[in-house]
Amino acid sequence: MLDAKYFREELDQTAKKLATRGFDLDVAKLQKLEEQRKEVQVRTEQLQAERNSRSKAIGKAKASGEDIQPLLDAVSDLGEQLDNAKEELKVIQQELNDIIMGVPNLPADEVPEGADEDENQEVLTWGKPKSFDFEVKDHVDLGEALAKGMDFETAAKLTGARFVVMRGGIARMHRALTQFMLDLHTDEHGYLETYVPYMVNQDSLYGTGQLPKFGKDLFHIEGESQDQIPMSLIPTAEVPLTNLYRDEIADEEELPLKFTAHTPCFRSEAGSHGRDTRGLIRQHQFDKVELVWLVKPEQSMDALEQLTGHAETVLQKLELPYRKVLLCTGDMGFGAAKTYDLEVWLPAQEAYREISSCSNMQDFQARRMQARFRRKGAKKPELMHTLNGSGLAVGRALVAVLENYQQEDGSIVVPEVLRPYMGGVEVLKA
């Protein structure tokens, strides 16, 4: 969440910046609540001071033999007024907090203004889309033809729409992609591989910003035990990885911290009805290799370039054409200050499709989580900056490999970097 100073000292300017994201901040309501908060805060402090003064007077009156009952009655009355004022202040602060928790991050100064994805800026393209001298098939037709290596019909019987069963060479390639990504990020990019829970509590989801605003996008767990804490399946490993330092204070020397994890991700895809209903592009369950950085504030913009570069390296080693896009203000995610999307070329769609989103959240998540660090010699800790990105979405990487490496007979050439993970197999055939 944003620093309270933006709502107390820079409200109009903050509202203008948020408007570039398509977010309408209710300035009048915030101003009214802030005025009420100040008035009740002053009244609370005055009542506390008066009560303390009367309490001291009781001791003096008692020592001099005076009747202290009137003073006792006055202190009791002041105590009741003070309790009421504190409760009123608590209600106002909670209402302010509820509003602030629903406000997105402010865009960084270099982020282009725009309403939607049509106004994103292409930064670069890498590789040249391959020309095929035969009719290109999409990943669904290719996967189903390879000994039913990709089976959506059976998955629908087992669970429902937007799930898949993979078999044989397709399943092995999916696993190979995961292993290749993890090895690359740990061996060459310096990430610490981390195994995390696939279920998280509400504090974790508040910390990274999924709650309270995006609860409908999650799958929530219903347990039989009455004392079970509310939990949800993770929508991304960003949630548990970033929350590793919730309510923690790191030493300056520990930063930057770089974590990677391979997990399944679970999303309800609320609001995406009718979009990408065919194939692996938009599933309720999908695998992803996540990259998370925790850094000092002055490091975060450079860290974003590095993190994005690490995701790009995966695509380059797979020799998959892609483009890098700087998102405009209106297309960024809730907690992001700056985001790059990597979009891989899919021949069957004749289009670039998102395969990674890399974001600098600055101190937006850290403030919610109270994830802090202490500089050497400093007394007070500071908020970290957090970053995250896909390195990559495994299912979409599989889609890209199948479509870009297809041959006329429906077989798939295995990218060279994946062959060591597939027992030396060079071609997937039916």
From Swiss-Prot:
Q: Which EC numbers characterise this protein's activity in its record? A: 6.1.1.11
The UniProt record lists the keyword Protein biosynthesis: yes
Q: Name one GO molecular function term.
A: serine-tRNA ligase activity
| Spans through the membrane | none
Q: Spell out the subcellular localization from the entry.
A: Cytoplasm
Name the positions where ATP binds. Answer: R267, S268, E269, E354, I355, S356, S357
GO BP: selenocysteine biosynthetic process; seryl-tRNA aminoacylation
**Is Magnesium one of the keywords?**
no
Note the InterPro entries from the entry.
Answer: aa-tRNA-synt_IIb, aa-tRNA-synth_II, aa-tRNA-synth_II/BPL/LPL, Ser-tRNA-ligase_type_1, Ser-tRNA-synth_1_N, SerRS_1_N_sf, SerRS_core, tRNA-bd_arm
Which residues of this UniProt protein bind L-serine?
T236, A237, E238, E290, S390
Q: Which reaction does it catalyse?
A: tRNA(Ser) + L-serine + ATP = L-seryl-tRNA(Ser) + AMP + diphosphate + H(+); tRNA(Sec) + L-serine + ATP = L-seryl-tRNA(Sec) + AMP + diphosphate + H(+)
Q: Which residues form a coiled coil?
A: none
A cellular-component GO term for this protein: cytoplasm
One Pfam family linked to the record: tRNA-synt_2b
State its role. Catalyzes the attachment of serine to tRNA(Ser). Is also able to aminoacylate tRNA(Sec) with serine, to form the misacylated tRNA L-seryl-tRNA(Sec), which will be further converted into selenocysteinyl-tRNA(Sec).
Give the multimer and partner information: Homodimer. The tRNA molecule binds across the dimer.
Q: What is known of its domains?
A: Consists of two distinct domains, a catalytic core and a N-terminal extension that is involved in tRNA binding.
What family does the entry list?
Belongs to the class-II aminoacyl-tRNA synthetase family. Type-1 seryl-tRNA synthetase subfamily.
What is the protein's given name? Serine--tRNA ligase
Biological source species: Idiomarina loihiensis (strain ATCC BAA-735 / DSM 15497 / L2-TR)
Q: What is the lineage of its organism?
A: Bacteria, Pseudomonadati, Pseudomonadota, Gammaproteobacteria, Alteromonadales
